[in-house]
Design a protein with these regions (language model features):
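Acidic-enriched, low-complexity/disordered segments with a strong bias for Aspartate over Glutamate
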Residues: 12, 25, 38, 66, ...
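Internal, well-folded beta-alpha domain core
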Residues: 91-176
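Hydrophobic residues positioned within well-ordered beta-strands of beta-sheet architectures
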Residues: 31-33, 79, 131
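A contiguous strand-loop segment
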Residues: 3, 84-89, 119-122
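Hydrophobic/aromatic-rich structural module bridging two neighboring secondary-structure elements via a short loop
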Residues: 65-111
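N-terminal domain-onset segments
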Residues: 1-74
Length: 176
């Protein structure tokens, strides 16, 4: 029988994660684009129990991540739509391309993140920026932009991401 489970964390657990995250030499260069789309398109891709939010937004993130400690830089991305569960707004990722298996396995197997191996490029040439995702030689996302100035830092906030994790039943009928 399917059931909804939450990975909600206490404020102490959230603070501990913030402390742990600042102890490593991780650095990411990120291009983020948010745009409005057709509300019907969002409704079509959201699984129950999620519903369409008031604003039909898509968030695309293209990044290169340097975790330090001698590991190679890898590419990471997200293509997500805004969603709602009961009274909580958040994002529902449709795909999270990654360039290494190490980046894929932990999030996919542990949290149900929709991670897939893919090629990711993020390039800045002067003020021009561009990023893309490609899988099996097919580019499925391209984003371009122009840097026009410095932005103020985003205020501290909580961001919610919804992931659905399920496994097919060994019997071949339904899910475990």
């Amino acid at each position: 029988m399917a059931r909804v489970r939450y990975g909600a964390r206490s404020l102490d657990e959230l603070r501990n994660r913030e402390v742990e995250a600042t102890k490593v030499d991780t650095w990411a260069t990120t291009l983020v684009a948010t745009y409005e789309t057709d509300p019907e398109a969002i409704k079509a891709v959201l699984p129950p129990p999620l519903s369409a939010p008031a604003e039909p937004l898509v968030r695309v993130t293209v990044a290169t991540v340097d975790v330090g400690r001698g590991y190679p830089i890898f590419g990471a991305g997200t293509f997500a739509v805004h969603a709602r569960h009961e009274d909580v707004d958040g994002d529902y990722a449709l795909v999270m391309p990654m360039t290494t298996e190490q980046a894929v396995v932990g999030g996919r197997e542990t949290f149900g993140e929709p991670k897939k191996l893919a090629e990711i490029a993020l390039v800045r040439d002067g003020d021009a920026v561009r990023g893309h995702f490609a899988r099996m030689s097919t580019t499925f996302l391209e984003i371009t932009g122009t840097v026009t100035g410095e932005m103020e830092p985003t205020p501290d906030r909580t961001r919610t991401s919804f992931y659905l994790k399920f496994l097919p039943s060994p019997t071949g009928k339904g899910f475990d």
